[in-house]
Amino acid sequence: MIRLPEKIRRPLEKVVRDLSTREDVYGLGLYGSWSRGDAAATSDVDLLVLVKSDIPDEYVERAVAEGLMIDLDFVPMGWFKGPLPAELDHKLFEAQILYDRDWTLTNIKMLMTKAYGSPERVEIRTSVHVVEADIYLSRATSALWKGDHLSARLFASTALEKILKIPLEITLQPISNSHFIEKAEEAAEKLGLRDVFTDFMETAGLNVVDRALAEEKSRLFKSLWDEMHLVVKQHSQTVEKAPFKAKTSLKYYFNSAFMQGVILRATSMVNSETYAEAAHYLEDTFLAMLETYAWLKSTVEKQSVDYTTLMRSIENLEKANPRVHQNAAKLLGLTEVEKAKVDELVKKAKRNIIRLRRERKRLIKTHLSKS
């Protein structure tokens, strides 16, 4: 078990004590960077919270304890009664059990420890990433056909990011939002897929990020969060009446502690001179936030939103405040987009996805069959 610094351990112990008194909470597990031992001083704490109540889906809340940023990841016990969702694999494998009322979390953790690196389980996880990549490639293709070149480029790079998770899974690397580029490069190099990683960096524009650009993206993130938070605050009743997933996502992303944590982490990465990593972290976080915000804005404006043309939809929804669309495009690196160039980027993403889909099982067999 990783020994935590005092400034992390003390507030975390208090949170664990408080949560363990709740009738609904059956297990608590520390996962993520603090569990793995690769956390920075500005890293958030990730806490898996197993609850007995029949919540519709997994969701995350941001909490603050003595200045410590904590993400509480609530998961229903019902998920453990059938086939285990692949998205829980990393969390369970990394988890340090801090509280377990009836041994449910401990038992499922033991099972995952045995199965995690098996070819069969890795095949399950990688198949999920293939589906995710296909979804975003479909979005990119649709956006290109509809003439939204900004969205087409955005989703082409997102599709490549999803397919790069396959090498990460096969090499049993953690999938970390703040170490994605570092780990993806290592994994791609190990599997002879360096060109796939290079294509991702070029498509996403991350190969040209310097300190000035990373710092500008951080400023844009803060500015956009402020603008969007105002809208969320003005329409709090709509948020409360929203479907479960939209409601919990809006409350998470537009919690001031969430924004503060993102800026602190990005600033730390910039100071460590990992500029592309900082840019990717900000862009990836912002895209998830933007999609959630688009739902709220479309509901308030009573306009439909086409997620395949997300950038055009935001432009239409924000006609009264065009700064949101303009700054979003800048933050996501979409300011200079030519049709011919985007067409080639979408084709490049498609080639790489087809390649990884074809080679996936062979790579798993080659690199994991002896495990």
Locate the predicted segments by residue.
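Generic hydrophobic, helix-prone segments enriched in Leu/Val/Ile
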Residues: 9, 103-112, 225, 349, ...
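Short N-terminal helix-initiation segments at or just after the protein's N-terminus
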Residues: 9-16, 98-105, 223-229
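A short alpha-helix capping/helix-coil boundary motif
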Residues: 15-16, 39, 118-120, 159
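Short, functional N-terminal and low-complexity linear motifs
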Residues: 15-16, 78, 101-107, 150, ...
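Internal, well-ordered alpha/beta segment that forms a basic, Gly-enriched binding/recognition surface
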Residues: 86, 90-139
